[in-house]
């Protein structure tokens, strides 16, 4: 098979294979390969070349960038997880497999259909593959100060980075505020005051924050997770368990649907790993309206057989 490899050389720690190392493994598996660094200005032009597989070596950021450019095309995306959280890879069951095992398994891998969300708001219209949210997680990420970012940058171990972000989240749970949100999800009125809202296409958000364990990225539905002020203790306990490497879920209510409308005031929004407004930009307007829909099975991903 002909493989186009999009490689993020900055992803993960120092022990990750180089792009050339991965190409060598692809050749050993009997495939041809074209290597493209995601750091090149026009890296995405490589996606226009004929290929049987688009392989992505990196984290959720570059996986999302590639996926959004492959919407509606029938070429499967094969993830080689090398990032910090690897939320999409974890949902697909490929995170803990070795890079060579994944590559040698491509010929027998399952082709998994994958939905794409679409978020319309003051920013225009943006597709997403992980989710959209506001509240606790988004506020924490938008308020990371220079000291926090320096601390994370100096951690070469991905597990240490995850733990550090989980600790930052936990430290903000007790002081977080609830926000009034007018929410319509299909024909249901879910309006109320919430500390967290996440409309999810996969199981995880941010630092492997597993909010929607039943999420199926190919069912044509979003999993909407909302948490009230009274549910802070559940979230705090879940984060503590994750920091201690215990398997647990926060047990928040999950609603399923495919058309979400949110009206709120002055909140920062994350769409996958992008923030709106961007850090340093003017504060969001007093009132915003967000419409979220789903395009069912717009992508194909490879998963273990």
Name each model feature, range by range.
Residues 133, 137, 198-212, 275:
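Glycine-rich phosphate/pyrophosphate-binding beta-alpha loops
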Residues 185-186, 191, 210-211, 216-305:
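ATP/nucleoside-binding phosphotransfer catalytic cores, i.e., glycine-rich phosphate-binding loops
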Residues 60, 197:
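Short conserved active-site loop signatures built around small residues
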Residues 62-73:
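Short Gly/Thr/Asp-enriched flexible loops that form oxyanion-binding sites at enzyme active sites
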